[in-house]
Each structure stands twice: as structure tokens, then as C-alpha cells.
Amino acid sequence: MGILYSEPICQAAYQNDLGQVWRWAKESNHYVDVQDSFNGDTPLICACRRGHLRIVSFLLRRNADVNLKNLKERTCLHYAVKKRFTFFDYLLIILLMPVLLIGYFLMVSKTKQNETLVRMLLNAGVEVNATDCDGYTALHYACQMKNQTLIPLLLEAHADPMIKNKHGESSLDIAQRLKFSQIALMLKRAS
């Protein structure tokens, strides 16, 4: 279940099929940055949508362009920051929480995985202040999601908390509107 792509390498990246991604990349390095005809996603964006670290790492080693945008004008960083727990993740966390806190450790592991993904993209030179079709940066999305793990990473990479989206809101405005006082304080210190 999920998204169906017209480009086989995009579908393989979305489904975490490293073998298929490797085969397509081996055939021609052009496939590493191919854009799907339906929504413009690249294999890197597809892998970031699902948080597939091995695929992202492989594509980055093959020099995938981290700054390519899809039809919504989003980069892989937008999707990495927007990545949430899946329904299955929540189900496992809830079921395993009473069992020796396994659910808690699963939650921490997934959060660390997402942090690692964002770090990889930042280290690869992704434009941290890139805006999508609505004027949102990755920092806007991190603030909306109250992601206190990723916000310091983005700020350290020089994300600008004062960039306004098409609704006239900056990341700081979003944090204040949603009453996320700790995040608002972080953003004020950075600006």
C-alpha cells in the first residue's frame, strides 16, 4: 500500500528494495536523479518519504542531487522532516510499551533514525532554507510537528526562522501560534 510510481527505481526506493535500486543505478547513473512523471519525486525523495536510511545512503554515495524538487517544489529534506511514525509503528509501540518498555525503545530508535536521515541530508549539502509551493521550509514543518529533536539540527545548519510562508507566517510565528514555548524560545535565540 502507498504510492505507485511510474519510474521503477522510484518504486524500489519507496519500497526499500536496495537490490533493485542498485540494479537501476548500475545500469545508468542517470537513474539516480530521474524524476517520476506523475509527481516529480526522485528516488531520494521516495526513500526519504519512508525513512529508508540504507537507500538514502546508497543514493548519496552515487551523488544523487539533494536539491532536486518535485512538483510540489519540495526537496528530500522537506519529506525527511515531515516523516512521522506509521500506523504500524504506533501499533507496535502501544502493544510493546507494557512489555519491558520495548515500545519506548522502539519509539526512541525510530526518532534517532529520523535524526540520522536529516543529518545525512544536511551533510550532503541540501539547501536548508528551500521553500515548497506554499513557502514552507523544513523548519516550518518541524515547528508544526513540535519536533524538538530536528529543530536544533536545522538551526545549526543555518535554517532561517524568519522566512515567511505564503500565509505570512515564519517558523517562529507557527511555534507561538501553537503555544510551543520551548521551540519559540529556541527560534528567538537563533534569529
Swiss-Prot record:
Per the UniProt record, which residue ranges are transmembrane? none
Cite the repeat ranges for ANK. 39-68, 72-100, 101-130, 134-163
Q: Which InterPro entries match?
A: Ankyrin_rpt, Ankyrin_rpt-contain_sf, ANR22
Q: Does the keyword Repeat apply?
A: yes
- The organism encoding this protein is Mus musculus
Q: Which UniProt keywords apply?
A: ANK repeat, Repeat
Q: Give the signal peptide as a residue range, or say none if absent.
A: none
Record gene name: Ankrd22
Q: What is this protein called?
A: Ankyrin repeat domain-containing protein 22
Keyword S-adenosyl-L-methionine attached: no
Q: SMART domains recorded for this chain?
A: ANK (SM00248)
Domain of life of the native organism:
Eukaryota
